């Protein structure tokens, strides 16, 4: 998809959702990606994020940028600062699509407000215990602080993978024809049926 290669996308958060989504989009051909995250890789991240053991202590955004350059030649811009009221314009001004994958309500509220006020397309991807959402800014409601830390839940890589697959497909459809779909993913209710071959 030619539009994907040049379209400026900023991904907020390089944790389980953001890192895997950035990797998926880069491997699909996205070449104009920025990832914003102030955190360093911790050993606990290795089960759900595409980082390696010898990278513990490295900035997540920096590691992701290096990995994707080595893997597919994608030059992801790594922003290793905390997104806040003073710098949100600076870090999001070049984006035409923002994907919010932050794991806290304060940062999600900042992205929601900024994108709403500036009429900037924004897709929110989030998850909790057995449940994930992919929602465009117009319908999105920032979760309460009680639901903040994704690490409070029994985080499963399979739910991360499903959420990232749905989010990346949502981004690709949006870039192809402007389609804006909202999704909820409930792991418990997911049905996979056997294929009967005759």
Specify the residue positions occupied by each region the protein language model found:
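Adenine nucleotide-associated cytosolic modules
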Residues: 1-198
């Amino acid at each position: 998809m030619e539009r994907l290669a040049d379209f400026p996308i900023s991904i907020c958060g390089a944790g389980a959702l953001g890192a895997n989504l950035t990797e998926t989009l880069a491997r699909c051909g996205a070449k104009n990606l920025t990832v914003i995250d102030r955190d360093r890789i911790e050993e606990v991240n290795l089960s759900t994020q595409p980082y390696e053991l010898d990278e513990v202590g490295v900035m997540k955004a920096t590691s992701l940028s290096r990995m994707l350059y080595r893997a597919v030649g994608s030059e992801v811009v790594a922003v290793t600062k905390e997104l806040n009221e003073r710098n949100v314009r600076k870090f999001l001004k070049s984006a035409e699509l923002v994907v919010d994958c932050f794991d806290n309500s304060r940062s999600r509220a900042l992205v929601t407000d900024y994108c709403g006020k500036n009429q900037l397309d924004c897709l929110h991807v989030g998850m909790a215990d057995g449940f994930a959402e992919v929602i465009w800014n117009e319908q999105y409601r920032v979760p309460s602080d009680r639901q903040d830390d994704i690490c409070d839940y029994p985080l499963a890589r399979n739910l991360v993978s499903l959420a990232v697959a749905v989010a990346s497909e949502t981004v690709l459809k949006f870039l192809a024809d402007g389609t804006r779909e909202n999704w909820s993913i409930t792991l418990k209710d997911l049905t996979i049926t056997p294929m009967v071959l005759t």
